[in-house]
Amino acid sequence: MLKILIPTVMLIPTAWLAPTKWLWPTTLLHSLLIALASLSWLKNASETGWSSLNPYMATDPLSTPLLILSCWLLPLMILASQPNHTAHEPINRQRMYISLLTSLQFFLILAFSATEMIMFYVMFEVTLIPTLILITRWGNQTERLNAGTYFLFYTLAGSLPLLVALLLLQNSNGSLSLLTLLHSTPPQLSTYAAKIWWTGCILAFLVKMPLYGVHLWLPKAHVEAPIAGSMILAAVLLKLGGYGMMRILMTLEPLTKELSYPFIILALWGVIMTGSICMRQTDLKSLIAYSSVSHMGLVVGGILIQTPWGFTGALILMIAHGLTSSALFCLANTNYERTHSRTMLLARGLQMALPLMTAWWFIASLANLALPPLPNLMGELMIVTSLFNWSWWTIALTGLGMLITAGYSLYMFLMTQRGPLPSHIMALEPSHTREHLLIALHLLPLLLLILKPELIWGWS
């Protein structure tokens, strides 16, 4: 565990001490080495499932894929941010930018590997600070302050009941260790209080996912964030909600059986509603942000149904969606750098100008609509099957949701790549090797996971 944490911390002095000329290459290489070293976590041979144990941190088959995804994203964020956001900024601000990204990765590693629920809660909250600074300081438009406020208050309002609920659990059990939490009993409360306690436990994670209804902060935050902010938000920060739900639901039995139904229905209804919103979007980043809400709705359904297939499908879909949506944000950013517009009508027909980028757009769009045999489809099918097994009425919602997903993914591809090239963007800068490498490092892991899906199966 320390072989990842210490180099991650040392990346901050590296960013501040590296010469100006070598700042980005040095930090990129350093973070890439950390990402490669993190792959050793996949080799989990222990019988209990827990490995790399020390009193505060451990990895198990649920947290390992998410930890590796967090480490994998830092070099990609540095690669994506190099020329555009930072070339015209003072050198100290560039160093600060890299330090923020590094601190975010450090907090995420601590969150995903925490063995104590309170430590997880603290890290869950602390990730808010670097993300908020990224959005409000490096965002594009003045609306970034509004987006930052939404992000802050939604997250805080959802998280405070969780702290109270965890302290209540600590009071009745004497411990909040994840290793013993599975075998503990929920606090003995009156029926009404128990229901409020259950909602308090789950609300913070539903806001973070986000569940349809408490999702308003997400499109704002995504649209206003710089490219690195959008990538880490879509790929890893939303997954904190799913991970926390999987961890805490184990202790909430038997309350979940009776209280989870409205949330499952709301999540599946959200898949259809946010998909329909995507069909009417004109802003490219906003479309990708709403598609995240749609996919996370399926994940919420898969987790709340609490079957082994549901959990496995949710984890697979979280990992696959993390790589896919991050790739889509990078592609949207390459368009934005050239056309200086996120409006799809003003940047059409880019296949004529950037044909190789169109190939990447095509693969990423197909991954988003869950083409077989990609992990996206595997995750969605497992969730849909476990929901259908619970109630066959859900097939109407999930089937329609998947149909709409295919519709808006193709709409996004056709609107950006096909059609006549507008007259105001005739002279475009050609695509760079850096951009192709960036997208390849998103999509290659996704394609290679087809060959060994048990790496992201989780517990089952």
Curated annotation (Swiss-Prot):
GO terms for molecular function: NADH dehydrogenase (ubiquinone) activity; ubiquinone binding. It catalyses: a ubiquinone + NADH + 5 H(+)(in) = a ubiquinol + NAD(+) + 4 H(+)(out). It is found in: Mitochondrion membrane. One of its GO terms (cellular component) is mitochondrial membrane. Disulfide bonds: none annotated. It is a multi-pass membrane protein. Pfam families: Oxidored_q5_N (PF01059), Proton_antipo_M (PF00361). One of its GO terms (biological process) is ATP synthesis coupled electron transport. Its EC number is 7.1.1.2. Core subunit of the mitochondrial membrane respiratory chain NADH dehydrogenase (Complex I) that is believed to belong to the minimal assembly required for catalysis. Complex I functions in the transfer of electrons from NADH to the respiratory chain. The immediate electron acceptor for the enzyme is believed to be ubiquinone. Belongs to the complex I subunit 4 family. This is NADH-ubiquinone oxidoreductase chain 4. It comes from Tetraodon nigroviridis.
